[in-house]
Amino acid sequence: MGNLVIGSRGSELALWQANHIKERLKKECSIESEIQIVKTKGDKILDTPLNKIGGKGLFTKELEELLLKGEIDLAVHSLKDVPVVFEKGLDLACITKRADVRDTFLSVKFPDLMSLPKGAKVGTTSLRRSMQLKLKRQDLDTESLRGNVQTRLKKLECGEFDAIILAEAGLCRLEIQGAKYRKAFSVEEMIPSMGQGALGVEMLKSHKHFATLQKLNDEESAFCCHLERAFVKGLNGGCQIPIGVHASLMGDRVKIRAVLGLPNGKEVIAKERQGDKTKAFDLVQELLEAFLQSGAKEILEKAQLF
């Protein structure tokens, strides 16, 4: 029997993630594997903001097509990029232990967000981040920032931006200091994207090793990520819309906090629920209903126009 084939995007971060799974497959499952690089739509179109490209699965669709054809055995994704609805026959075989979930402020000249001058230019790929930045500083000029981690940092260092916002997990995985000034936002200051900090391994449910990969699953991370994904799914949301949601466990209790709004920060809903872990999905439903009653659907429809 040949090696399993892991499908991965070609960026340094994506390959770190694929190699991480490759090493764990060998160590924990005694399975040999090799990596096949796949270019996705999101990798090919670099001069357009992600929300303007259109379609779901900008960083996953091509990998899913190869899974369905049997040309690769598994695909390793940043879980935050994985759509909440799968192609028929596909599912997550495991969700790995979460790394740091926070978003991080980086700048060459300014130590933190509040020290930026009026009208400062802040780069981010994410409407979710833009929305939450605008909530704090309506005067900021938030602009699309595309490319891999190193490309984004070069744009900062060259003076194209006064500051940029990146995921802390990616910086840690690549062991990058990033810039002279680096400060992570707390989860309360900036609610992360669903699944942020975790890796998701996608496979055909019928694959003979699908169940085997449960050995790589982290129960607590998976539980929290599934709560977050259920919330986004309940809003018919995708990866490129301004929704932040974060679930955390505190012993036998769970807290779920969420935010959604227009990218300009003008109309925003933010709420949280907490309760017994055994009623976690009921809490998600309760939170969803509270958002819907506050006009979430209407705000998300308006957000599509940005």
UniProtKB/Swiss-Prot annotation:
CDD domains: PBP2_EcHMBS_like. Pfam families: Porphobil_deam, Porphobil_deamC. The keyword Transferase applies. One of its GO terms (biological process) is protoporphyrinogen IX biosynthetic process. Belongs to the HMBS family. GO terms for molecular function: hydroxymethylbilane synthase activity. Binds 1 dipyrromethane group covalently. The modification S-(dipyrrolylmethanemethyl)cysteine is found at C239. InterPro entries: HemC, Porphobilin_deaminase_cofac_BS, Porphobilin_deaminase_N, Porphobilinogen_deaminase_C, Porphobilinogen_deaminase_C_sf. Gene3D superfamilies: Periplasmic binding protein-like II (3.40.190.10), Porphobilinogen deaminase, C-terminal domain (3.30.160.40). Pathway: Porphyrin-containing compound metabolism; protoporphyrin-IX biosynthesis; coproporphyrinogen-III from 5-aminolevulinate: step 2/4. This is Porphobilinogen deaminase. Monomer.
